[in-house]
UniProtKB/Swiss-Prot annotation:
UniProt catalytic activity: (2R)-2-phosphoglycerate = (2R)-3-phosphoglycerate
UniProt protein name: 2,3-bisphosphoglycerate-independent phosphoglycerate mutase
Biological processes, Gene Ontology terms: glucose catabolic process; glycolytic process
Keywords: Glycolysis, Isomerase, Manganese, Metal-binding
Catalytic center residues: 63
HAMAP family linked to this entry: GpmI
Pathway assigned in UniProt: Carbohydrate degradation; glycolysis; pyruvate from D-glyceraldehyde 3-phosphate: step 3/5
Amino acid sequence: MNRPKPLALIIMDGFGLSEKSDGNAIKQAHTPNLDKFFEEYPDTVLDASGEAVGLPEGQMGNSEVGHLNLGAGRIVYQDYTRINKAIEEGTLPENDALKNAIQHVKDNNSALHLMGLLSDGGVHSHINHLFGLLEMARVKNIEKVYVHPILDGRDTPPRSAEKYLNQLEEKLAELGIGEIATVSGRYYTMDRDNRWDRTKKSYDALVLGEGLEASDAISALKQSYAADKSDEFVIPTVIKKNGQPVGTIKDNDAVIFYNFRADRARQITKALALEEFDEFERPAEHPENLYYVCMAEYDEEFNLPVAFPPLEIKNGFGEILSKEGFKQLRIAETEKYAHVTFFFNGGVEKKYPGEDRVLVPSPKVATYDEKPEMSAYEVTDKLLEKLDEDKYDVIILNFANPDMVGHTGFMDAAVKAVEAVDECLGKIIPRIVDMGGQVLLTADHGNSEKMKDSEGKPHTAHTTNQVPLIYIGGPEGVGVKPGKLADIAPTMLEILGLDTPEEMTGQSLLTR
């Protein structure tokens, strides 16, 4: 096979496949270009969710996970799955960071605090991970265990917390260990937008025992509902017994924050655990000699113990291109720029030699249904300019529209989003083929193909549906077979005539 120049991987973010037309923005959109590509070129389907991308079975895919798998050429096991495995295999008590936290509590005759999002949403945390930690504390005979549940209502229904609080109370009773000490909504404890007044409310409840008060967790929830505040918005509430807080965070204690997603775990971690902190004034009671464990790495500059540090991905697609002296271009609008750079490169911020990046600003609107085309036309113009330079061997391009507009739940807007992408593909793809290039057209997960749930209400989440793969401009007689996202990098390496490194366990999907 002659080496194409350029070889482009085009990712239509949130573009899944479904036979249903009802609520399917992709089927309802007018897409003459995509229709033509599907008709004229070999196509197949890829798995983009669950175990095929390193998530638990049945878990919908997402953009971070999708791009990690696309760039790594192997299934990248997510923190969620790694923690599940450790619990299933009984290795949690042997984890260094967790073992040290237990030892710290024993040495100081102090308390262990378990804090995290209490739900089975699986996006930031999972209630089973809390249960695994409680079982570990019981096996290790820790006497003082306090739980600080953060209520969800975003990755779960808005008023579903009672179910999870009941499950937690039952688990504590079954194990004969631990008490619930505070209850708060994620709006406060998990803020990520530098609204430090929210973080401070959580801090005050955790450290000072100040805030709303209740005699138990369910009462705390009920008084919040009575004030018309759903799970996410529960004001930090201190559980009191005999007029005293059940358990505040004190000197020499240990905290395990069991959220595995970093972005919403950083602010409260800074406030509780970092020596240098000036977002608000911390009180004299600020805990000294606190052993604070992050379940995953929230920020390497925190220098805190991490239970499940990031896995290093050696010989990803971008790294191999660079070693071979190939020139590569990564291009996307702001919303998906990190995905075609940081995540595609295996969660590494550094740019490889020979890798150029183009960031096109996303439009400044409150929600993207107001501008469903987003910056797709600008991304397209920028790419066409870059094609004129004729210097890139490989291009990685992301169109954000089907995902970001799909999240709004507005069907008409999602249809327009898909049509905008179709129009852009009609300009880009023929141009690449005319240059002697080839295109792999795919997606990272589903979204826009399901805009309605079973009750006919707006559906705003990702899906577990398969995604398409179309191989455009390839040699006569070469097709593609079904696979998973991790098979894309080995497929591209074969097209480029490069060997697949042993670290890549994905398979080339080319058929002859």
